[in-house]
């Protein structure tokens, strides 16, 4: 009697534990905690506050630098990265992942030429874009609208631009090449965009 009363609960607990792990491990993988995350493995949309947002670089899903601490890729770049870098060639379309109001369209230090769009308590930053802006401050933008093009590595005619490449040519902020730096700020605080995919 003592044998059954002890081992039946133990076997039951082991069964629950094994079942839980077999369910939990794939879930970790699905959300990027076990394997690398590439948005095209799932969908090209993100979900924040139950509203759908769309991927800002259509056709380009390779992330070259993730949110958080990293080795700075170039002089002037911080070790804390407040967004993600999406590899895309110069001239590629950048679309608004959300509707909102343009609150900034200018050179923004290490971010280079940047467009900011606000929607409630969220601010979306699209950085290292072309200096030929397609939008202006105060303009209402619809989700999916082309708002900018991926900018070149080198930009000229930016007064007091401290960012330079190894040849001394001025760069589009702290950058080593053409890409989109995409960031989301919630209530003014940087959040990891990949947490919302």
For each feature predicted by the language model, list its residue ranges:
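Zn2+-dependent peptidoglycan hydrolase active-site motif and core
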Residues: 79-82, 96-137, 154-173, 178-179
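Bacterial N-terminal signal peptides
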Residues: 12-20
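N-terminal Sec-pathway targeting helices
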Residues: 1-13
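Short, exposed beta-strand-loop hairpins at the edges of beta-sheets
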Residues: 181-186
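Surface-exposed, glycine-biased beta-strand/turn segments
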Residues: 25-113, 120, 143, 153, ...
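Post-signal peptide N-terminal regions of Sec-secreted extracellular proteins
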Residues: 139-140, 187-190, 197
């Amino acid at each position: 009697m003592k044998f059954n009363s002890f081992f039946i609960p133990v076997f039951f607990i082991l069964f629950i534990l094994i079942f839980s792990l077999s369910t939990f491990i794939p879930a970790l993988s699905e959300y990027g905690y076990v394997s690398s995350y590439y948005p095209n493995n799932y969908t090209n949309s993100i979900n924040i506050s139950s509203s759908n947002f769309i991927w800002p670089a259509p056709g380009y899903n390779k992330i070259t630098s993730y949110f958080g601490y990293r080795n700075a890729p170039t002089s002037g770049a911080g070790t804390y990265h407040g967004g993600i870098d999406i590899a895309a060639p110069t001239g590629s379309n950048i679309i608004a992942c959300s509707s909102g109001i343009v609150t900034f369209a200018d050179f923004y230090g290490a971010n280079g030429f940047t467009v900011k769009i606000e929607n409630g308590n969220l601010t979306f930053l699209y950085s290292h874009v072309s200096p030929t802006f397609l939008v202006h401050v105060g303009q209402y933008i619809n989700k999916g609208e082309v708002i900018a093009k991926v900018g070149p590595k080198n930009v000229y005619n930016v007064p007091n631009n401290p960012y330079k490449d190894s040849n001394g040519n001025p760069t589009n902020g702290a950058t080593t090449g053409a890409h989109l730096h995409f960031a989301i700020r919630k209530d003014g605080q940087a959040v990891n965009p990949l947490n919302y995919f």
